[in-house]
Amino acid sequence: QLKKEAEMAEPQGSNGIAISGDLTKSGNAMLLINPHTSFYFRGEVHVVSEEGLNAYGAVTWGQFFVYQGFNEKTGWMHTSTYTDVMDEFKETIVKNDGKLFYQYGEELRPVDSTTVTLKYKDGEAMKEKTFPMYRTHHGPITHQVDDQWTASAMMWEPVKALEQSYIRTKQDGYEGFRNMMDIRTNSSNNTVYADAEGNIAYFHGNFVPKRDTSFDYSEPVDGSNPQTDWKGLHTVDENILVLNPE
């Protein structure tokens, strides 16, 4: 029974292989797209428009762009990346005159707060619960570590991420594809690439924060110390990028 359950476990990760035209019989570059997902997780679609969109590949529920696939000139696929794209900041909370602040260097900054109302079903009745949400400049308060409120920092540019995913499907060569990667909102994936000109490439991650390496970001860091803050993002060229390896 345990063996059967293990065989039915959800797949993890994916495989992608780009082969240079120098190594193929046809002389064309080849791209293997092998996402390890459950059977119904992604459907295959052909997206065509009169304005020139012409892409085929896999989409996840609700996506209007081809997540991994190809158009007439380029092909792209993604594997799950182990690049560190998320950190936790322990905040020092101070309450003054009924208002919440957090320590940041020598200053006290106000904690941002909003309220959220969620509706839920209780038997046949619909009920709702309203509760506060808090955040600092590091990100939303998501949990406590050592009895300290802890903010989770991550890529949160949903519109830019959507733009990058759509723009990716319209590129006709490496130059445009490489420029698209400069948007740097693909936070969870590596990218394997091939095109009709014979180019192949591998991009390890895309959204990679710059950090002070004197701190251990594998654990929550002290959010009151400005030195722990992210210092922007690494450029695509600063990350691992392999183009046409010999």
Positions of predicted regions on the chain:
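Mature extracytoplasmic enzyme cores
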Residues: Q1-E246
